[in-house]
Amino acid sequence: SLGSPAVAEPAVIAE
């Protein structure tokens, strides 16, 4: 959600 820092988010990041 936030972008790079996966804070309380699933392992799926915008990378």
Curated annotation (Swiss-Prot):
Originating organism: Sus scrofa
Main function: Growth factor that plays an essential role in the regulation of embryonic development, cell proliferation, cell migration, survival and chemotaxis. Potent mitogen for cells of mesenchymal origin. Required for normal proliferation and recruitment of pericytes and vascular smooth muscle cells in the central nervous system, skin, lung, heart and placenta. Required for normal blood vessel development, and for normal development of kidney glomeruli. Plays an important role in wound healing. Signaling is modulated by the formation of heterodimers with PDGFA.
The protein's name: Platelet-derived growth factor subunit B
Subunit annotation: Antiparallel homodimer; disulfide-linked. Antiparallel heterodimer with PDGFA; disulfide-linked. The PDGFB homodimer interacts with PDGFRA and PDGFRB homodimers, and with heterodimers formed by PDGFRA and PDGFRB. The heterodimer composed of PDGFA and PDGFB interacts with PDGFRB homodimers, and with heterodimers formed by PDGFRA and PDGFRB. Interacts with XLKD1. Interacts with LRP1. Interacts with SORL1 (via the N-terminal ectodomain).
Domain of life: Eukaryota
Signal peptide: none
Disulfide bond positions: none
Location of this chain's protein in the cell: Secreted
Keywords linked to the UniProt accession: Developmental protein, Disulfide bond, Growth factor, Mitogen, Proto-oncogene, Secreted
Keyword Cytoplasm in annotation: no
Molecular function via GO: growth factor activity
UniProt family annotation: Belongs to the PDGF/VEGF growth factor family.
